[in-house]
Amino acid sequence: MNKLNPLKFGIIGCSRIAKKSVIPAILKSEFAELEMIGSRTNDKAKEFSNEFNCKKNGTYDDVISDDSINVIYISTPIGTHEELAIKAACAGKHVYCEKSSTDSFTSAKKMVECSKNNNVRIMEGFMFRFHPQHQKVKELINNKKIGNIDSFNG
């Protein structure tokens, strides 16, 4: 059996979700490697790199232009997502963008068209549907263990 080459991730944005969820998941996966961390400030990029034993760090553009990276995880403020996702796609990188990926249909359309034109994938980071805590809540609801549901916002 052939072993798949791991996806080499570049992180753009040193957010809490990157720190607590995404980077630990990358480090645990046999199918992914943490290649580089980028931030607006060198100090923050170095801090995250040291914490996660990542050898490379730099700016957002450094991450996008690094030839060893094939997937970019974007975890920055929503107003930066379109520009960063398009730059990454134009550089031939797949994009995993934290939710919400954009605040407009026009912006989303540009991001998707760019990824199609560059033969890369783009995905929004909405992954809670099958999270164990949500599955447990679903089980409790289905087994009528928590009473009647009058409304739900999720």
Per-range role (PLM):
Residues 5-7, 120, 147-150:
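Nucleotide donor/acceptor-binding cores
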Residues 128-154:
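Predominantly a Rossmann-like dinucleotide-binding segment in NAD(P)-dependent oxidoreductases
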Residues 36, 70-71, 121, 151:
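Short, Asp-centered acidic motifs that coordinate Mg2+ and/or phosphate
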Residues 71, 77-78, 82-129, 144:
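Beta-strand-loop-alpha-helix segment that lines the small-molecule cofactor/substrate pocket
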Residues 60-63, 101-103:
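Short, acidic/turn-prone active-site loops that include or flank metal/cofactor-
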Residues 53-60:
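Conserved SAM-binding strand-loop segment of SAM-dependent methyltransferases
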Residues 1-52:
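N-terminal Rossmann-like dinucleotide-binding module
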Residues 21, 47, 62, 71, ...:
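Alpha-helical elements of Rossmann-like donor-binding domains used by nucleotide-donor carbohydrate transfer enzymes
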